[in-house]
């Protein structure tokens, strides 16, 4: 990771999946059958009803309630003992054990059983909710095909594990099946369902020679793919790894609740002890039973699980909702960060535009005799060494005129190609030294271009040959269809300012900004210039919110690292950019940035609401219990009810997709 990356990657692995107060909820991946979890509660409930309605042992009224207590009480007694043995005395199990034993001691047998019964019911539903949220997050594992069909040189088919397929192998994918590994499409143009990766419902057409990502579904026909990279480095595996890691990267709210619970639990136990002891002592040793009962009510309602379960559950839910839309947050902390965004900065090419350039006009300088077609071929020979969209367009244009590697008679090969970062390339072609790129590249080598403009095309590639200006190539690029809507949605969400940073010429960037409704633009920027502009923007809005940068992953890693929240657009972006980014948008739809902000804001609002709701109800019942206005029944129902209500609230998080 870039050492300039100021983002906080807070990991917290203690009490994973539990409360932080010692509340280790049982939502392992291999959950027990439902009947096994419900049976002890059903037995306890039946015996409790028998004890209340028609106790068969009037001489020993406590006996039936002890029997009712055991099915739900023994597991909690065991958990309490295990936590105490680990040195964690102040945990929710200790609270429940103290409260119920105290209730038995003062003869409140039905309440003692009811406390653990309702507590167990609440735990059951909380565990199921957490388990469901975890399954949502881990559902991408189901996208992984179990086998791949490898085609050998003789055309024979062999079913093997995707992990066993080697780079260069040819695999076959049947219609309706998922592509198991990243590769190059060998079949003619085919359609693929990419919804599982990008969240986009529209099928995507891919041409022969273009890349196909693992996890896509072939539509309508059998296709063959040449494997580009091993399974461990495939797009699907990268997505699964990011989503699984996100579940363990805690938000600030989650870590605060964990720390709060560690202090809160011993404090409420101490307060309960004071309620039980101080008033009777001040009254001359009378009223012990009354004040002990009030202390027990205080203990029961004080259990912090409504907070310590619902808060991480809300972040699990937010990450899960986003992942189904092809928006991959690398942790709950970034849900918080996007909720506080006030400025969004975009790269231009490949992010707000399609990045699919088309060569429009090739112009030779006066006195250059090689001709436009030959100049294009020579420039393409150098540009073959680059992966930039402009370079690919020039190569494609030259190839369409017969300059292909398969046509050795007409193909040109460049030697000694070197990149001058942010400016272009230099190399030797057919004995000529070529400089290819921005006008600034040629000017840096003492060549005057005159910055000749043309009315066609948005982007200019200048060429110098043997120390002289040779000509230029004009290329056109189009805004993405969703870009204007994406900018409009950001403004509607209250984003104060949008901005474009680009290395393209001013006229092209200004035209795009005006077309899309972007507030601010900066052009002719080198990579370090983008970083400087990002620093300036962050300083300007330091007191008003956070700044996001959205890039397609090509040469964007430094500015992604400088931003408060980095969005990598398109899951096929560079590894460095995807590694540096905090949020990866699998599709090329800029409107997904607005969706991410909506999910982040709804998650944050829900967390705040749940915290206020839980604390408000608990404090009210604590005071009522201490003053004698709340019973153990009220305490346990309030505790269980608020916990389940907070859990249910987490399912209010929706995508807000438009």
Where are these regions (language model features)?
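Histidine-centered metal-binding segments
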Residues: 1-32
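Bilayer-spanning, highly hydrophobic alpha-helical transmembrane segments
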Residues: 43-46, 255-284, 297-315, 608-637
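P-type ATPase nucleotide-binding
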Residues: 359-497, 506, 515-534
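Actuator/coupling domain of P-type ATPases
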Residues: 51, 55, 59-147, 151, ...
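N-terminal membrane topogenic signal
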Residues: 28-43, 264
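Conserved catalytic phosphorylation-site environment of P-type ATPases
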Residues: 93, 97, 146, 197, ...
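Membrane-embedded transport module
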Residues: 541-544, 581, 586-658
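Conserved ATP-binding TGD loop and adjacent catalytic N/P-domain core of P-type ATPases
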Residues: 431, 465-609
């Amino acid at each position: 990771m870039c050492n300039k990356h100021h983002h906080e990657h807070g990991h917290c692995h203690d009490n994973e999946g539990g409360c932080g107060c010692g509340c280790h909820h049982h939502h392992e991946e291999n959950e027990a059958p439902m009947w096994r979890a419900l049976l002890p509660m059903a037995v306890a409930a039946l015996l409790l009803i028998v004890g209340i309605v028609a106790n068969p042992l009037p001489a020993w009224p406590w006996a039936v309630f002890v029997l009712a207590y055991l099915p739900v009480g023994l597991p909690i007694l065991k958990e309490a003992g295990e936590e105490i043995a680990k040195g964690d005395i102040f945990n929710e199990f200790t609270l429940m054990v103290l409260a119920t034993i105290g209730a038995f001691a003062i003869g409140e047998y039905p309440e003692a059983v009811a406390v653990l019964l309702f507590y167990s019911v609440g735990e059951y539903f909380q565990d199921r909710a957490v388990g469901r949220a975890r399954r949502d997050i881990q559902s991408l594992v189901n996208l992984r095909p179990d086998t791949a069909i490898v085609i050998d040189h003789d055309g024979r088919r062999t079913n093997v594990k995707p992990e066993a397929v080697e780079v260069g192998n040819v695999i076959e994918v049947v219609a309706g099946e998922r592509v198991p590994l990243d590769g190059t499409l060998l079949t003619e143009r085919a359609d693929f369902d990419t919804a599982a990766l990008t969240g986009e419902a529209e099928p995507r057409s891919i041409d022969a020679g273009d890349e196909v990502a693992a996890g896509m579904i072939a539509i309508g026909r059998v296709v063959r793919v040449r494997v580009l990279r091993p399974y461990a480095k495939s797009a699907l595996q990268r997505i699964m790894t990011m989503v699984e890691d996100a579940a363990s990267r805690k938000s600030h709210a989650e870590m605060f609740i964990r720390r709060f619970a560690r202090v809160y639990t011993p404090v409420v136990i101490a307060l309960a002890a004071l309620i039980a002891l101080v008033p009777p002592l001040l009254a001359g040793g009378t009223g012990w039973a009354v004040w002990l009962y009030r202390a027990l009510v205080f203990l029961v309602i004080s259990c912090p699980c409504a907070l310590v379960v619902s808060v991480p559950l809300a972040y699990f839910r937010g990450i899960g909702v986003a992942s189904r839309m092809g928006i991959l947050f690398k942790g709950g902390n970034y849900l918080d960060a996007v909720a506080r965004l006030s400025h969004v900065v975009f790269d231009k090419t490949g992010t707000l535009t399609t990045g699919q350039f088309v060569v429009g006009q090739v112009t030779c300088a006066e006195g250059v005799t090689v001709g436009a077609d030959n100049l294009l071929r020579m420039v393409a020979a150098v540009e073959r060494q680059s992966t930039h969209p402009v370079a690919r367009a020039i190569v494609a244009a030259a190839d369409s005129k017969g300059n292909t590697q398969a046509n050795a008679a007409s193909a040109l090969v460049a030697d000694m190609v070197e990149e001058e970062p942010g400016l272009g390339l230099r190399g030797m072609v057919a004995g000529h030294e070529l400089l290819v790129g921005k006008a600034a590249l040629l000017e840096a080598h003492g060549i005057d271009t005159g910055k000749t403009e043309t009315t066609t095309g948005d982007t200019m590639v200048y060429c110098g040959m043997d120390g002289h200006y040779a000509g230029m190539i004009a290329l056109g690029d189009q805004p993405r269809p969703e870009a204007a809507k994406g900018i409009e949605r950001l403004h509607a969400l209250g984003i104060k300012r949008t901005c474009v940073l680009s290395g393209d010429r001013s006229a092209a960037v200004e035209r795009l900004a005006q077309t899309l409704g972007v507030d601010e633009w900066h052009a002719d920027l080198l990579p370090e210039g983008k970083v400087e502009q990002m620093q300036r923007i962050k300083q300007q809005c330091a007191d008003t919110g956070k700044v996001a940068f959205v890039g397609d992953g090509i040469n964007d890693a430094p500015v992604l690292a400088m931003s408060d929240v980095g969005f990598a657009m398109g899951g096929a972006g560079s590894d460095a950019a995807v590694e540096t980014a905090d949020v990866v948008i699998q599709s090329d739809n800029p409107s997904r940035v607005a969706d991410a902000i909506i999910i982040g804001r709804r998650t944050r609002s829900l967390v705040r609401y749940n915290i206020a709701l839980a604390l408000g109800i608990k404090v009210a019942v604590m005071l009522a219990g201490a003053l004698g206005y709340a019973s153990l029944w009220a305490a346990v129902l309030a505790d269980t009810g608020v916990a389940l209500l907070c859990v249910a609230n987490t399912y209010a998080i929706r995508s807000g997709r438009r």
